[in-house]
Amino acid sequence: MADRVIEELDRDESLRLISSGGIGRIAYTSRFGPTVLPVNFTLYDGAILFRTAENGPLDQDLRTGIEGADYQVAFEIDDIDMAGAMGWSVLIQGPAHHVRGPEREDAFRACVEPWAPGIRELLVRIVPSRITGRRISLS
């Protein structure tokens, strides 16, 4: 196997890699324990934005029950070349909250259509408090 190197990515490069959106994985602690779910996402105004079902399992798990309190999550995006054993990953950590009020309309227009069937009108935003990334490539 060829020699490979791991490169730490800075915030700007990490955001550049995920700027086109796509599929990411939200990780959080649900009422059943650690949970990781794939979602279609958009990078909007420096934050991760995705849609889910109002009162669905993800919505219920992300509610703290305390007005104004945010739920801390992780969000991972990657692009892997299995044949070449190379790729990159970006990890975003920060609070997740529902998008409501006047900002909802613009955010909703910017958000990608979910692949999952059903009505998914609730917008969730993850505001990055920490962004890290790594790339594995040939040396």
Describe the role of every protein-language-model region.
Residues 3-25:
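Short, basic/aromatic recognition patches
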Residues 21-54:
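Short beta-strand segments
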Residues 36, 49, 74, 91, ...:
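Conserved hydrophobic/aromatic beta-strand scaffold that supports enzyme active sites
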Residues 39, 52, 77-79, 128:
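Residues immediately flanking
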Residues 50-52, 75, 133:
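Short hydrophobic/aromatic-rich beta-strand segments that constitute the beta-sheet cores
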Residues 55-112, 120-121:
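Short, structured beta-strand-loop surface elements
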